[in-house]
């Protein structure tokens, strides 16, 4: 009882010495809301429950409402109600039962539980009971002889015990309590059959006398108080022969004993107890039940002969004469199953069953029998008493023919007893022992179709399993009929298991396994197509090794092997040139065809389309000025601009962009010319790499006093790659020592032959400073452009090229655009390469804002999403959706192109080095070499060639004998080169120019020193290596679990440990983990480092499997200067 006047169900049951279910049943009848034995109720509700239980059980002699025990009042009412019915309807005296001799079987050992219960009995006159068989025999004798008392019955049992049962061949008796000696339960079938025959004769010749007198009831009640009396009730009417001979399994068992074996007797010859099952009491003396004379299936007694024990199930009492059921002795029909031949409907809910089902009680387990058996006159029992009059008439008919079938009913003799489902004694949905009896009925109907063995471990199953492995395992698969469901097929289970296994297997597939599987699939696919192609087409004159292998239907390893034998080391991603591809393909017998593609320098998109033909007009030419740095290119451009701009604007000219437009009067007509300042400008190089054709005419400026220089030759190659006409301007003709003819001679060696020499190249001698022949040069440019027939359509969406682009802090991405066709207007949506833009503003070369720009007009435009790439082509689209789609496709192509460039052949050339160096993908050292004599230059160049060039390339821009001049300074400043002088001097003004342009000049007199410094400079361009430096070593001496991880308690043996350093865990001389030291603590404080001789805690986020004895090696990575590798 709690402080708050609340009491729990289990406390109340303990106070009343009842079970929890008794209290719960009483609470349900009183409509008190309780859920389980731990529910709390008020003290008033507890009083109501006590009053209800006291009314039902004034003497409190019954333990449980649902327990099958013998009750005083009920037995009295049975005799009062049933005696007239039996005597009137049967017309046979009940005293004939006195002729039967009782059968007494002495138990081997008296269980201690009986002793304990006997001390608690309410009847003090009978404290010592020899065994349960005596009590039951006494009870039987009392029913048959009303004039005798209990002591006389006891003596009669002892004296009248038949000798066949006392024979040593008979099995020991099993008491109500849990059996101790299991092995003695085995019986012989012959002895049980002899007993059955003897019993049959006695039973058929005698008619049981029903008790009608009160004294008999008193004697019975006195005997009832013993715990052994909890058993099947005794039939109190004469058995009537039942024509149904097939369903008498229980009756056969009953007639194997003499009439002296009465209910309550534990002696059951030839019948072992079921292991793991509780012996259920029989219904002897219950209201509404008959006295089953001669039925050996009693609570606590050995079960039927020849019937193995059932593991996991309690022994059920026999159901003969129970209310709601016939005397089903050996009847295989079970509730809920089809009835046997000649049997009425036994199913729950049937008419007959409904009439006789109210007096059934649940069986009692051995543990429950150890407590006091208390009277409980429940409503269920009262209902059973009222229905007994009808039961007494029909039930005996089931007993008559039992003895004839018992010896031969071997299969049916193994059928366990069953009970009819009782609606009044058990609530629907509750699992009871009756449910398992229903299953027994279902299985016994078709014995050949038995369920699979399922051994259910019971309370008493520990030592009985070996004795009862036969019947129980074969017959029982589940305990409750309410839980019975068809078993899932093995095939379905196996399929589902396989599916789960496959699914888990896929989940556990590692990256390496997946790669291996894909490689195997690819190999199988390639093996399936081993047919060589007739020919392969090589686009863009290059293919990677993998692409070539795919085209030849070979493995990439075959291509690499072929290249290796040719002295070429390649990888699957390395690009191969056309010559190498042809060599490899011919080895495998496949010809190579070059794809009909325009050369790289030509434009990939034609600016003039077929729709523009009707609206074409002449457009101004685009002129590119190229040449060496010191050959007067800038002076020439300045002269052209100054001569064609009004004198009022001359002083305020500021070139904002790399392209500008000038007007020139030719043949009384004003002509516009667009000049592109490309020499030294990165835009021209980017456009050549992109393969675009921007310029219409290339002007090559060559100094008359210096002749052709390396950059002059490079400019010639640029113009030829772009396939544009070249106009040569021989500058500085006014300077002393100028020789235009020598320049023509040098150019003729490069296949540029002047017109006056019979060639087709226009060469004009000019002087930018003196402004000589400037007009003639412009006229030649116009003549050449007229021959080219340059046209465009201004009435269409604009197309053009990005000259240059940069990111402005205030304006954002800014691009210089050259319109080549159409008209560009503000608000147009355009795609420049892989960049989307919408024109927000445009300005010309003078900084004036304009709204539109026609063909060959350079403008500076704003409104791009990001900075476009110089050399990309742009095009205006009608809507943003279309432009965005085009941009996405170009972005994909751009990535592929960049990848191809990265995987290009590693053969080093001047142009490829320049391109990669500009992109920051290659370390490059630019040099300008000047020496005293040509022999020194050649020697130095030969030594530089021997330096390692795998990681850093040496590019000598200029190597010549002579002194270091200002021209060399200018070249070094433009290219970011270092000037190296060997036994030479500086020209006048060179030192000043070098300081002004911040150019590094190195002078040497010994070649070895020169080579050493150059090698050190090359190594300085290399990124330093990360080298492992050891910090210390610690040993794990303890581990601590913290949350999901673990902390290692360590002792620093050498060096020190630092937080966030790298560590390596070594166990059994093997490295099991390598990562970072994330947590370092000294006692409870976070520390940065712990030195030798101290203890600390080490934690790693990605490792927690610490084991005592692990060794932790701490280290860190430091940078180390790299050296050149061969």
Curated annotation (Swiss-Prot):
It comes from the Bacteria. It holds the Pfam family EF-G_D2. GTP binds at residues 627-634, 677-681, 731-734. Residues 731-734 are annotated as: G4. Residues 93-111, 211-224, 240-252, 291-315, 327-349 have a biased composition (Low complexity). Residues 677-680 are annotated as: G3. InterPro entries: EF-G-like_DII (IPR053905), IF2_II (IPR044145), IF2_N (IPR006847), P-loop_NTPase (IPR027417), Small_GTP-bd (IPR005225), T_Tr_GTP-bd_dom (IPR000795), TF_IF2_bacterial-like (IPR000178), TIF_IF2 (IPR015760). Residues 116-151, 181-195, 254-264 have a biased composition (Polar residues). GO terms for molecular function: GTP binding; GTPase activity; translation initiation factor activity. This is Translation initiation factor IF-2. The lineage of its organism: Bacteria, Bacillati, Cyanobacteriota, Cyanophyceae, Synechococcales.
């Amino acid at each position: 009882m709690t402080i708050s006047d609340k009491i729990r169900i289990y406390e109340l049951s303990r106070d009343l010495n009842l079970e929890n279910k008794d209290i719960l049943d009483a609470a349900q009848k009183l409509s008190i809301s309780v859920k389980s034995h731990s529910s709390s109720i008020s003290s008033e509700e507890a009083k109501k429950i006590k009053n209800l239980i006291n009314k039902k059980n004034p003497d409190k002699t019954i333990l449980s409402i649902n327990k099958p025990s013998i009750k005083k009042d009920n037995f009295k009412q049975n005799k009062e109600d049933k005696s007239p019915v039996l005597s009137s309807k049967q017309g046979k005296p009940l005293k004939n039962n006195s002729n039967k001799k009782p059968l007494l079987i002495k138990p081997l050992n008296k269980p201690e539980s009986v002793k304990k219960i006997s001390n608690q009995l309410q009847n003090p006159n009978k404290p010592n009971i020899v065994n349960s068989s005596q009590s039951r025999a006494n009870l039987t004798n009392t029913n048959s002889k009303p004039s005798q008392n209990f002591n006389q019955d006891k003596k009669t049992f002892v004296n009248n015990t038949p000798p066949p049962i006392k024979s040593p061949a008979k099995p020991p008796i099993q008491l109500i309590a849990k059996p101790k000696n299991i092995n003695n339960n085995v019986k012989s079938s012959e002895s049980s059959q002899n007993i059955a025959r003897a019993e049959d004769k006695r039973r058929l010749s005698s008619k049981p006398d029903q008790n009608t007198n009160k004294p008999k009831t008193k004697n019975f009640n006195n005997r009832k108080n013993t715990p052994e009396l909890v058993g099947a009730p005794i039939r109190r009417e004469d058995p009537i022969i039942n024509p149904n001979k097939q369903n008498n399994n229980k009756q056969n068992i009953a007639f194997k004993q003499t009439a002296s074996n009465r209910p309550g007797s534990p002696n059951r010859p030839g019948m072992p107890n079921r292991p793991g099952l509780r012996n259920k009491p029989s219904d002897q003396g219950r209201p509404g039940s008959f006295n089953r004379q001669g039925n050996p299936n009693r609570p606590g007694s050995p079960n039927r002969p020849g019937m193995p024990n059932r593991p996991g199930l309690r022994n059920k009492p026999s159901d003969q004469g129970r209310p709601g059921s016939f005397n089903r002795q050996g009847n295989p029909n079970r509730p809920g199953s089809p009835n046997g031949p000649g049997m009425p409907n036994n199913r729950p809910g049937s008419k007959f069953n409904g009439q006789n089902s109210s007096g059934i009680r649940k069986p009692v387990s051995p543990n429950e029998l150890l407590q006091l058996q208390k009277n409980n006159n429940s409503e269920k029992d009262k209902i059973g008493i009222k229905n007994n009059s009808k039961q007494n008439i029909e039930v005996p008919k089931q007993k008559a023919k039992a003895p004839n079938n018992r010896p031969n009913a071997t299969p049916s003799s193994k059928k366990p007893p069953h009970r009819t489902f009782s609606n009044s004694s058990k609530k629907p949905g509750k699992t009871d022992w009756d449910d398992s009896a229903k299953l027994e009925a279902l299985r016994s109907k078709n014995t050949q179709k038995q369920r699979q063995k399922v051994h259910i471990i019971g309370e008493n199953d520990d030592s009985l399993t070996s004795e009862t492995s036969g019947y129980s395992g074969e017959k029982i698969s589940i305990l409750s009929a309410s839980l019975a469901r068809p078993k899932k097929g093995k095939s379905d289970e196996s399929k589902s298991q396989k599916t789960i296994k496959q699914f888990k297997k896929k989940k556990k597939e590692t990256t390496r396994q997946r790669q291996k599987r894909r490689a195997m699939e690819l190999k199988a696919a390639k093996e399936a197509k081993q047919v060589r192609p007739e020919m392969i087409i090589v686009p863009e004159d290059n293919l990677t090794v993998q692409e070539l292998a795919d085209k030849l239907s070979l493995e990439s390893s075959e291509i690499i092997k072929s290249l290796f034998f040719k002295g070429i080391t390649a990888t699957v991603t390395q690009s191969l040139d056309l010559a190498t591809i042809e060599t490899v393909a011919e080895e495998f017998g496949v010809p190579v065809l070059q794809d009909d593609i325009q050369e790289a320098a030509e434009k990939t998109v034609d600016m003039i389309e077929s729709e523009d033909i009707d609206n074409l007009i002449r457009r101004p030419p685009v002129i590119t000025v190229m040449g060496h740095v010191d050959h007067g290119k800038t002076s020439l451009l300045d002269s052209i601009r100054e001569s064609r701009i009004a004198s009022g604007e001359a002083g305020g000219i500021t070139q904002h962009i790399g392209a500008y437009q000038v007007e020139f009067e030719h043949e009384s007509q004003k002509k516009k010319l667009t000049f592109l300042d490309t020499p030294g400008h990165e835009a021209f190089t980017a456009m050549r790499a992109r393969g675009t054709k921007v310029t219409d005419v290339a002007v090559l400026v060559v100094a008359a006093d210096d002749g052709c220089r390396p950059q002059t030759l490079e400019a010639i190659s640029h113009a030829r790659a772009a396939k544009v006409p070249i106009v040569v301007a021989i500058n500085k003709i006014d300077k002393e020592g100028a020789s235009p003819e020598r320049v023509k001679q040098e150019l003729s060696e490069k296949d540029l032959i002047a017109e006056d020499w019979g060639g087709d190249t226009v060469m004009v001698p000019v002087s930018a400073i003196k402004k000589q022949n400037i007009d003639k040069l412009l006229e030649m440019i116009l003549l050449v452009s007229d021959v080219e027939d340059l046209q465009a359509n201004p009435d269409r969406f604009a197309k053009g090229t990005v000259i240059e682009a940069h990111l402005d802090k205030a304006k954002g991405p800014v691009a210089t655009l050259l319109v080549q066709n159409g008209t560009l207007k503000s608000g147009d949506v355009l795609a420049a390469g892989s960049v989307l833009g919408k024109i927000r503003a445009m300005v010309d070369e003078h900084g004036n804002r304009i709204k539109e720009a026609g063909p060959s007009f350079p403008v500076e435009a704003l409104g791009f999403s990001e900075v476009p790439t110089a050399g990309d082509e742009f095009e205006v689209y009608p809507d943003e959706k279309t432009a965005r789609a085009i941009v996405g496709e170009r972005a994909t192509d751009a990535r592929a192109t960049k990848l191809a460039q990265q995987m290009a052949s590693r053969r080093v050339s001047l142009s490829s080095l320049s391109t990669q160096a500009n992109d920051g993908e290659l370390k490059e050292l630019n040099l300008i070499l000047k020496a005293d004599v040509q022999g020194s230059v050649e020697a130095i160049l030969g030594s530089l060639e021997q330096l390692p060039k795998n990681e850093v390339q040496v590019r000598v821009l200029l190597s010549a004998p002579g002194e270091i001049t200002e021209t060399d300074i200018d070249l070094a400043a433009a290219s970011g080169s270092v000037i190296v002088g060997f036994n030479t001097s500086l020209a006048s003004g060179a030192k000043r120019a070098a300081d002004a342009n911040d150019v590094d000049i190195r002078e040497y007199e010994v070649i070895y020193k020169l080579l050493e410094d150059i090698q050190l400079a090359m190594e300085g361009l290399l990124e330093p290596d990360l080298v492992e430096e050891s910090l210390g070593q610690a040993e794990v001496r303890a581990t601590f679990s913290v949350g999901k991880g673990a902390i290692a308690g360590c002792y620093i043996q050498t060096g020190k440990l630092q937080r966030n350093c790298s560590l390596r865990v070594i166990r059994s001389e093997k490295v099991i983990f390598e990562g970072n030291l994330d947590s370092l603590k000294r006692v409870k404080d976070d520390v940065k480092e712990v030195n030798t001789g101290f203890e600390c805690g080490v934690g790693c986020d990605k490792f927690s499997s610490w084991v005592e004895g692990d060794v932790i090696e701490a280290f860190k990575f430091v940078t180390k200067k790299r050296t050149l590798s061969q």
